[in-house]
Amino acid sequence: MVLRELSAVMQMGNKVVTRTELSSLGWKLFLFMGSYREKGDMKMSEKKESVKTYILGKWDTRTIVGVAIGAALFGVLMNFGGIRVFTNTSLTTAMLVDVIVGGLFGAVPAAVAAFFGNVISDLIGGWGFWLDWSIGNAVLGFFVGLLGVYGARINDGIFTGKQAVIYAVLVIVGNAVAFGLVTPFLTYVFYSQELTITMGQALAAVISNASVQIIVGIPLLFLLAKRNARSTNLKQED
């Protein structure tokens, strides 16, 4: 599958690629990383992972590639995959990148993908680099990516109703901390700006981001866990 997708990328170099085609291809490659496992991964997954591992992640080739694809996809979707709800604030599917990277790779990988994804978004948008929002997105990615800490093992096909509730609470708390506290504070420190507009953007971001990450994110996590559980069972039978 991955060879077909990479071949498609090479073919696109010879023609004009629409934003929809680019985003669709990005999601396919990204989700493929969630189900791909190298030989020996099954034995590794059977070992009890430490909380530290679920927070920091395992920075192997799979994680690095997943974070890189996630950051690129985040940057594209922040500009082309959303609906404007406030000044420079959108209801966007880019927020699902936090969910997938966090579920598959851990909290710090999700934070890194969100940080660099926002930097890429600023570069594509051409409105300058806003470090305050990049750090805010990294904080949110960290909260969202804590799934493994409370027992959600997406790679092993484990995601329960109780874990979904905990996830939803952390999404709300993470958005509130990231955009209600961290981003406004950094806006004032870095840019000495009046915070009225920033607080309006923060409120819109909290509501829109949490909505996407809960309403779409929870079914997506169940779907990924179910698919990985099926893949795990097939490999065990082999």
Which residue ranges define each predicted feature?
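Loop-helix junctions at membrane interfaces
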Residues: K28-D238
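Methionine residue identity
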Residues: M1, M10-M12, M33
